[in-house]
C-alpha cells in the first residue's frame, strides 16, 4: 500500500490518428522511452499506461492509445480498445500534425463533448515545418502558430480554434513545446484533483469516534486490509477523527467498552445484518461500499436505481460489474451472496451476468438492473461514464452496498448519514 492507488490518479489519454507522434509525446512528457516509436503506422496496439508526478497536480496516469484511424480486422479491434479508454479519462490530449483535422479528430471531439471531458489539441511535428526552431518556449509557440498558419491557411487554423480549447504546438522529436503542454495539462485537469475529496470525514466532526468493522474472510488479502478500508482510515485521520477497527464478532464488546458512543459505524456490507443488530439505533451506520457509491459514483442516482429492485420480474437479467479481476472462492459477494439475497428478497427467478475490469457490455438495454462494486480499483470517471450509458439506455444502476442493505431490509438506516440521499429516498417512497 506504499503507492497511490491508480484509481486516485488523474487519467490523461493521448489520442489521434496513426503516425502523428502520440507515443513520442508520451515519451517526451515522461522523459522515458515508454512507448515504441516507429515510422510504421499502427505501432501502438494495446493502450500503454505510465504514471508520473506532475507538480503541482501530483500523480497522474498517462494512457497512450492506438490510432483512431486504424484499419483491417485487427485495426478495428485496436480502435475498440481506444474507445474503451475514452470512458475512463479525466483529460484528453488530441494529437494531430500540421496537416490539420479531419473526420477522425472530429469524432474524438464529439465523444469528449458528450462526456463533458476536457481536452487539449496538440499540433505535433512542427520540426518538419522548420528544422531549427527558435529557442524559448514562448517564442516557439508564437513562431509555430505562424508557420502552421502559413502552411494551412486561415481556414484550417480557424477550424482548430473554433473549439475554444488550448492549442499547443510541439516537436516531440526536438522536445520543443513539451513544457507548454505540461502547463496546459495542469490548467485543464478537473479542479477536483487539486483538492481532497472526502470519503467519510465530512460525516463526523474532528475528535469524534468512528468504528470500522472489517471481517476477515477467505477472500481477505493476507497481511493487510483491503483498499477501501485503508483509504477510509486515512481520510478520517486527515480530519483528526478517532478511528477504531474491529471484526464483526468483537463489535458488541468494542461498543460496550466505549465511554462515549461512536458518531459513526462503517461496516463491510457483507456483515450488514449482524452489525445492524449489534449497533444501537441511535448510532449512525453505513458501509464502505455505500461510502464509495458517493466517492466514485453518484450516490443519489444509485439510490434511485436501488428502488428498481421492487420492479424485478422473473426472467429479468441483472448485470453485476466488478472493477478488479479476482479468483472467486467460497461465498463470493458478487457471484454468490448478492444473487442469493436479491432472489430471496424478490422471490423471482432472475438471471445474473458478470463483467470484470474495464469490460462493459455494448448493449445494456437487455438488463433490468446494473449492480456495480464499490469501484475502489478504478477511477471515478469510468464509473460516471457507465452511469451515463445506463441513463441513456434507461437502465437503473446501483452498487453492492446499497443492494445488500435494501435486500436485507436496512436500506433506510444505511442512508441516514447522507442527508441528501435520504431525502431523495423519502420523497420517492412516501
PLM regions and their residue ranges:
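Conserved G1/Walker A P-loop phosphate-binding module
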Residues: 1-76, 84-85
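Short, charged N-terminal beta->alpha structural module
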Residues: 24, 28, 212, 219-235, ...
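Canonical P-loop GTPase G-domain recognition
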Residues: 118-120, 125-133, 139-198, 202, ...
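G-domain G4 guanine-recognition motif of GTPases
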Residues: 65, 96-99, 120-131, 168-176, ...
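Redox- and metal-dependent alpha/beta enzyme cores, enriched for Fe-S-associated oxidoreductases
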Residues: 294-347, 353-359, 364
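An anion/phosphate-binding loop that grips the pyrophosphate of nucleotide cofactors and donors
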Residues: 89, 262, 367
Amino acid at each position: 500500500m506504499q503507492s497511490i492507488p491508480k484509481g486516485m490518479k488523474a487519467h490523461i489519454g493521448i489520442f489521434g490518428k496513426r503516425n502523428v507522434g502520440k507515443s513520442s509525446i508520451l515519451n517526451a512528457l515522461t522523459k522515458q522511452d515508454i512507448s515504441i516509436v516507429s515510422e510504421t503506422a499502427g505501432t501502438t496496439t494495446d493502450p500503454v499506461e505510465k504514471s508520473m508526478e506532475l507538480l503541482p497536480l501530483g500523480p497522474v496516469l498517462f494512457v497512450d492509445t492506438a490510432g483512431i484511424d486504424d484499419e483491417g480486422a485487427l485495426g478495428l479491434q485496436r480502435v475498440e480498445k481506444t474507445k474503451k479508454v475514452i470512458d475512463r479519462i479525466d483529460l484528453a490530449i488530441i494529437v494531430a500534425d500540421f496537416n490539420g483535422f479531419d473526420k477522425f479528430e472530429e469524432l474524438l471531439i464529439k465523444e469528449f463533448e458528450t462526456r463533458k471531458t476536457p481536452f487539449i489539441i496538440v499540433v505535433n511535428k512542427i520540426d518538419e515545418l522548420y528544422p531549427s526552431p527558435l529557442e524559448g518556449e514562448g517564442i516557439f509557440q508564437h513562431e509555430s502558430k505562424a508557420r502552421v498558419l502559413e502552411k494551412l491557411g486561415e481556414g484550417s487554423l480557424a477550424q482548430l480554434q473554433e473549439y475554444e480549447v488550448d492549442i499547443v504546438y510541439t516537436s516531440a522529436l526536438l522536445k520543443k513545446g513539451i513544457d507548454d503542454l505540461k502547463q496546459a495539462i495542469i490548467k485543464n485537469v478537473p479542479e477536483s484533483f487539486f483538492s481532497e475529496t472526502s470519503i467519510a470525514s465530512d460525516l463526523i466532526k474532528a475528535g469524534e469516534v468512528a468504528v470500522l468493522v472489517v471481517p476477515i474472510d477467505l477472500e481477505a488479502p493476507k497481511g493487510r486490509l483491503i483498499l477501501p478500508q485503508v483509504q477510509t482510515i486515512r481520510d478520517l485521520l486527515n480530519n483528526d477523527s478517532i478511528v477504531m477497527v474491529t471484526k464483526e464478532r468483537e463489535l458488541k464488546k468494542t461498543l460496550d467498552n466505549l465511554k462515549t458512543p461512536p458518531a459513526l459505524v462503517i461496516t463491510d456490507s457483507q456483515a450488514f445484518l449482524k452489525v445492524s443488530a449489534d449497533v444501537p439505533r441511535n448510532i449512525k451506520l453505513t458501509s464502505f461500499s455505500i461510502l464509495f457509491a458517493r466517492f466514485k459514483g453518484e450516490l443519489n442516482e444509485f439510490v434511485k436505481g436501488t428502488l428498481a429492485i421492487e420492479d424485478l420480474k422473473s426472467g429479468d437479467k441483472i448485470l453485476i460489474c466488478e472493477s478488479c479481476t479476482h479468483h472467486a472462492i467460497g461465498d463470493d459477494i458478487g457471484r454468490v451472496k448478492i444473487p442469493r439475497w436479491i432472489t430471496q428478497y424478490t422471490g423471482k427467478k432472475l438471471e445474473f451476468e458478470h463483467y470484470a475490469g474495464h469490460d462493459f457490455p455494448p448493449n445494456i438495454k437487455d438488463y433490468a438492473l446494473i449492480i456495480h462494486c464499490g469501484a475502489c480499483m478504478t477511477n471515478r470517471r469510468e464509473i460516471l461514464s457507465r452511469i451515463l450509458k445506463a441513463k441513456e439506455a434507461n437502465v437503473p444502476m446501483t452498487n453492492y452496498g446499497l443492494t445488500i442493505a435494501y435486500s436485507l431490509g436496512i436500506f433506510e438506516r444505511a442512508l441516514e448519514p447522507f442527508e441528501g440521499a435520504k431525502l431523495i429516498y423519502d420523497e420517492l417512497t412516501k
